[in-house]
């Protein structure tokens, strides 16, 4: 078979191009893991440890002071969680860990009901296989928040409530440490299920899944964290807002939105760098949209979810943020599609 | 001279210059054609046909996204059923590209994205929602005239897909979700929904049998189904509760049982389904069951006689599944434009083709002259 010089040169250029492209995602993904996921999980694990220690100290010497220390540790742990909440991928997807971290929204008060049962006999939590079969409603931060803040529980005055709190906090810290260790000891590409015969590199497939997770999480922030509790389209359900009792709803949103910007810029080349090289207009448009998200969230008053605003007032105040998140989601979808990723067709919109 | 119904049908189709599949299928198709809706970008929607080599042989633009094709059993007619809330079924002759007919739902009704022809091809059977009341309907029209012959209750709310058990009985997946086209993704009866599978007589609309999930699982929406030659019906659920709830997602049922026989699978696989089953399909022998989950990114398989889990094929955004005429073999289509052929019992899967910039929509159908 004859191959012209031009055809050969073109083939070499094409191969070189695709190789460079693959390497680009190799580096970006490696750095997303080493400079974002692992450090954020280190923070999350460290604050979970602090929370476990604080609840142990509280139960050892119950007082308003030790309670306050435990609450502060809890708030820090929530904020660390919000940095990685967008990522329902990898170790956190096993043993229902992701859903156990937050049993939210708990529309039927399952957490409180199950906590009351545990508090009636906390010794059940010490049995060897308790945590392997325990309900996800009592395995994570939603349960801890209830014990620290819900009026049904009094961890200062009632030993059994505090015992439950201490056990859950300890379990939460262990789980988080396990997730961290698995991230430290594996590569992101270990956590995907590649198709037979696919031509896409594992790195490409992982980055694609991360982008899908990011896009989906924007919907969570806009819909579940903001629109639903304030009654943007329906009746308000403020008490079902995320971490409402500990008044962490708005800080959590703000942390999520800042995390997006962080994610966009982590590593070298970062997602932003690659996007700027290939799709500069879209890359810049997303950059502006992500900045606008943070700006719009900062416009909301600190007591936005807790003060006595009317539904109409809350909706009016939320509009710029709702529009901004929608816009950033569109920009992100457009960009990742142009970068050659599939954001899902049947998986995003079936029937 | 009195004209028999069959003769009349033949003459009607002849008058419309519709050939039979057997007389007109191109050699390139090698006796079989696959049909699916697909989209290019966000606004360009089509229905198309491809042969066993995966090459697109024909396509026609559609006004909106379609959900499942409906294929005439004898003549070269394929319909694209609009996605819920659907207001059209566009019929084409895929061998010429000619648009044959558009059928619209009854007044104040919409389609659910699926339809089926009777075994003799003389009747078109659709599932429809009378949206002012939420009543599920099975509507039987003459084909090709489109005249409404019968209108039966589906036996529930939200009749999504139906399959023929035999020439007189249809099995209906009543999903249980009441919706209205004004806000079609809002579920109006989430807390009270009661999905069921209904076996309905096509002769008189009589309910022959029904089965439904137990009350604790009332959010287990029954959406897609298939029936094998042994009369076993497989059901794929779309759970409307929380993602973390441990619920069954696949079941078998028969016409003489009112209980659902849930199929086991490893928990790590069940969790990956994300509570969502796409297509449900038996193989040619009826012994292998395939269930796709685009959200999970795989197709799962079971051995039907023993009800045991066989394994999965990982495939991003996969949804379309159809049996070939070989035992234990399926063709799969995905939102990434791929067409694959899988033999799950020998763990062999290979890509037939991939059409760039094209998203195969939910369901795949096939006409086969080789059987």
Q: Over which residues does each language-model region extend?
A:
Chain B
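N-terminal export signals
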Residues: 1-26
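A short beta-strand motif characteristic of beta-propeller blades
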Residues: 55-60, 100-105, 147-152, 208-214, ...
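Blade-loop segments of beta-propeller domains
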Residues: 62-91, 97-117
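Repeated scaffold domains used in trafficking and secretory/extracellular systems
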Residues: 65-71, 110-116, 157-163, 219-224, ...
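Residue-level detector of Asp-centered blade-edge/turn motifs that repeat once per structural unit
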Residues: 73-74, 119-120, 165-166, 228-229, ...
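Asp-box/WD-like beta-propeller blade repeats and closely related beta-sheet repeat scaffolds
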Residues: 108-113, 127-165
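Short, conserved, GDST-rich strand-edge loop motifs in beta-rich repeat architectures
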Residues: 127-130, 173-193, 236-247
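Beta-propeller blade signature
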Residues: 138-142, 190-202, 248-255
């Amino acid at each position: 078979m004859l191959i012209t010089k031009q055809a050969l040169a073109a083939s070499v250029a094409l191969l070189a191009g695709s190789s460079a492209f693959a390497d680009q995602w190799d580096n970006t993904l490696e750095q997303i893991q080493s400079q974002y996921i692992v450090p954020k999980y280190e923070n999350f694990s460290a604050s979970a440890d602090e929370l476990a220690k604080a609840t142990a100290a509280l139960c050892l010497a119950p007082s308003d002071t030790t309670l306050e220390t435990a609450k502060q540790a809890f708030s820090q742990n929530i904020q660390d969680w919000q940095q990685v909440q967008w990522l329902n991928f990898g170790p956190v997807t096993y043993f229902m860990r992701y859903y156990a971290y937050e049993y939210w929204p708990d529309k039927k008060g399952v957490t409180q009901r199950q906590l009351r049962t545990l508090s009636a006999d906390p010794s059940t939590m010490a049995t060897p296989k308790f945590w392997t079969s325990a309900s996800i409603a009592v395995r994570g931060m939603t349960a801890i928040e209830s014990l620290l803040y819900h009026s049904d529980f009094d961890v200062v005055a009632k030993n059994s409530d505090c015992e439950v709190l201490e056990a859950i906090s300890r379990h939460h810290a262990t789980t988080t440490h396990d997730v961290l260790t698995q991230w430290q000891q594996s590569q992101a590409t270990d956590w995907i299920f590649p198709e037979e015969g696919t031509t896409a590199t594992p790195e490409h497939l992982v980055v694609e899944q991360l982008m899908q997770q990011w896009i989906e999480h924007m919907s969570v922030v806009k819909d579940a964290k903001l629109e639903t509790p304030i009654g943007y389209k329906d009746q308000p359900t403020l008490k079902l807002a995320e971490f409402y009792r500990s008044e962490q709803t708005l800080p959590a949103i703000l942390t999520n939105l800042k995390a997006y910007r962080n994610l966009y810029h982590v590593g070298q080349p970062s997602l932003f760098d690659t996007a700027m090289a290939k799709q500069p207009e879209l890359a810049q448009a997303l950059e502006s949209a992500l900045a606008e998200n943070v700006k719009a969230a900062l416009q909301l008053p600190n007591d936005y979810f807790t003060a006595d605003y009317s539904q109409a007032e809350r909706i009016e105040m939320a509009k710029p943020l709702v529009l901004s998140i929608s816009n950033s989601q569109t920009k992100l979808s457009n960009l990742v599609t142009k970068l050659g990723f599939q954001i899902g067709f049947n998986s995003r919109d079936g029937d | 001279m009195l004209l028999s119904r069959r003769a009349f049908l033949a003459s009607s189709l002849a008058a419309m210059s519709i050939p039979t599949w057997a007389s007109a299928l191109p050699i390139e198709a090698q006796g079989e054609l696959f049909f699916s809706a697909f989209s290019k970008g966000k606004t360009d929607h089509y229905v198309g046909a491809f042969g066993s080599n995966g090459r697109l042989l024909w396509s026609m633009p559609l006004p909106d996204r379609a959900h499942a094709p409906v294929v005439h059993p004898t003549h070269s007619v394929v319909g694209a059923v609009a996605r819920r809330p659907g207001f059209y079924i566009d019929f084409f002759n895929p061998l010429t590209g000619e648009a044959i007919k558009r059928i619209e739902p009854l007044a104040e009704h919409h389609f659910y994205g699926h339809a089926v022809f009777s075994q003799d091809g003389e009747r078109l059977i659709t599932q429809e929602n009378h949206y002012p009341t939420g009543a599920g309907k099975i509507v039987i029209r003459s084909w090709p005239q489109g005249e409404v012959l019968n209108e039966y209750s589906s036996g529930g709310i939200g009749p999504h897909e139906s399959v023929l058990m035999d020439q007189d009985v249809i099995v209906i997946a009543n999903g249980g979700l009441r919706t209205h086209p004004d806000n079609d993704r809002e579920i109006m009866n989430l807390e009270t929904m009661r999905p069921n599978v209904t076996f309905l007589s096509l002769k008189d609309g009589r309910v022959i049998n029904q089965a439904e999930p137990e009350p604790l699982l009332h959010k287990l929406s029954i959406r897609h189904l298939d029936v094998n030659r042994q009369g076993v019906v497989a059901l794929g659920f779309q759970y409307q509760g929380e993602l973390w709830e441990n619920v069954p997602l696949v079941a078998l049922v028969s016409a003489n049982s009112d209980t659902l026989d849930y199929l086991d699978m490893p928990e790590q696989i069940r969790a990956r389904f994300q509570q969502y089953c796409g297509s449900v399909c038996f193989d040619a022998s009826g012994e292998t069951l395939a269930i796709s989950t685009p959200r999970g990114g795989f197709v799962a398989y079971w051995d039907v006689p023993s009800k045991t889990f066989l394994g999965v094929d990982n495939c991003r955004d996969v949804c379309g599944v159809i049996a070939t005429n070989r035992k234990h073999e399926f063709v799969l289509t995905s939102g990434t434009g791929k067409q694959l052929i899988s033999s799950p019992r020998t763990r062999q899967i290979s890509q037939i083709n991939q059409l760039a910039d094209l998203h195969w929509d939910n369901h795949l159908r096939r006409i086969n002259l080789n059987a």
